[in-house]
């Protein structure tokens, strides 16, 4: 079948509005344009964005001679409770907001213009623990075929063996006939189909797919007048007591959890934004991504295939116990099989997908019903695809706490809270803070008591009792925050494979060292790889000069949990994990904000450090500076302006901390091996006196219609950032469109759709969609600084 993108020609309005809708281009996040108010029912979950229902409209033109053709609409993601209407008739309903789904248009079309309406609900707040976005936030395609054709998702490709490399290609057709197939490096072949044709291909000297060598092959299948092109990788996944094997060799998964949003763009699933996110994560030492906590986009799979990043695709954040009042629980039982089927259909041909996860922190796994459901879902996935293992992210300590009544959702309590909130809204008052349940309860507890308490709590005997039966019903046991159980459980359960499905940043070194010794410890996913909208303040260490309150109230917009910040800048924690996971040996230097040494900040268990790679702290001369050096070495030395100011031996760690008086100039870290030979060196240089506004594009040329990321920085004349320079920047664009503007600050009262933003530690980010030619970005700051940058259009 042939696909036509339906990204333009749409309008969007609030459902029930009588005024014409505004023109929009898909993918589109309607929630990002809504106000953020203290009356938002989504509150801290959504970053205080208001929730509404939306109606999208466009026309589909079908010529008379095509009316008998097959027409199938594909929606890659509509949040949520999507209704699809064609010519006034309801053609489809799909409640889950994160799955792709298909609509057979045949019963509803007529020749000429057809009215297509899509309704997306999001007024039913709260319905998510994080910022979901709303509307048609992923692409839409119209699939068409005339006569006999290859069925949608009808080409399935699987590696059967590696020596020799044998690949199976299954092709489903709507009628008998001849199927023709070509694959790179092989002669063309054909086979008769009675509805399905099965090809077995032998590839001599096959180029294997791995994260280090992401080799891809192209497979072209033709049948009658139809043609399908698929890419695939020759790779095989195995799991057992030897651990997780990729192409027959043990492979340690070193991953990062990410949410689906793209920072300043909201939930918009733009291929350029997705490619950038994957690139940033891989550059910072991660070889895998966990799609938390919902099925990932097709764009993410394409990029992970291309760039070489493993994927754990995850289904959902809850099963039959609510975590928010209006989440997916009411639909789960009727829809989970179809949802999983569509997830596997999406993932099947992608070599990057190596794990399926049935859920996240589902305390149902502590109950008899949930234990049985764990097995049912695992078996169901095996029936769809037995080439990949199945896991589930279980919060070990929370399973125990929920079993004794802590943090459990109650419909009655939720109803009373909703009634109180509605009355407060009618009075124009802020509603009382909701009682946290489920994962939010655990997050709040961790924020109060710290990560060490939560990890120690997971070692209680009751935690084992309330997880062991569910773990027995999955291929790999997913431990959220259970690192202190690893050694004990590997010994107690000699057949169990363990995955750190969600972990604290400061455990990266411990994990890596233990995983090298224990094959059945297969991997780790840190929370979180990149910051995300919603679930505000959960991972933030923020100071009073940037955050008005430490209670997560209005103004807070992001979690602050990323090792990479909301604008895509790697922080000190990213440098630490690069070294801890042995992506390289360092050394790297990061410095805690010297102007805030000793100051109180917002609490979080998910923050290991707020250090950043800067030695430009104007006005802080003589003040104590907390310096961190990350290195795989026997010893590190700290040198300031040519004088050694500290030396530390590294034992069972890759982090050395120093406290020294701040003095501008050159700060160097030197690493040494056990024989005291220098093996690495890095330095930070203080910025000079004069300040200017500097604009830097991440790419020198960008294709028309694609995204250009432009960093706005206060710098000296040499381009060194000044983190203590602070101001407001106004941005104009000629020859393109400003689609996102903001800073990484988790507390931000501006809209990312504004043309003005405050800086955060001297920086902000503008995202520009290129027009047909060159694009000029003009920035001005507080009437004092100005700069412009022209980005050339790529031919």
Q: Each predicted region: which residue ranges?
A:
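Edge beta-strands of extracellular beta-sandwich domains
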Residues: 227-232, 676-688, 785-794
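Substrate-binding clefts and catalytic carboxylate motifs of secreted carbohydrate-active enzymes
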Residues: 5, 11-18, 78, 125, ...
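Short flexible loop/turn segments that cap and initiate beta-strands
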Residues: 178-179, 212-216, 624-626, 632-634, ...
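Accessory beta-strand-rich segments of carbohydrate-active enzymes
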Residues: 3-17, 30, 46, 51-151, ...
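Extended acidic/polar, glycine-enriched regions
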Residues: 110-111, 170-239, 657, 661-664, ...
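Short glycine/proline/serine/threonine-rich loop/turn segments at secondary-structure transition edges
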Residues: 66-69, 109-113, 127, 203-216, ...
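Beta-strand-rich binding/interaction modules
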Residues: 164-191, 197-199, 625-644, 666-671, ...
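Active-site-adjacent substrate/metal-binding segments within catalytic domains
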Residues: 35-62, 66-75, 79-86, 92-95, ...
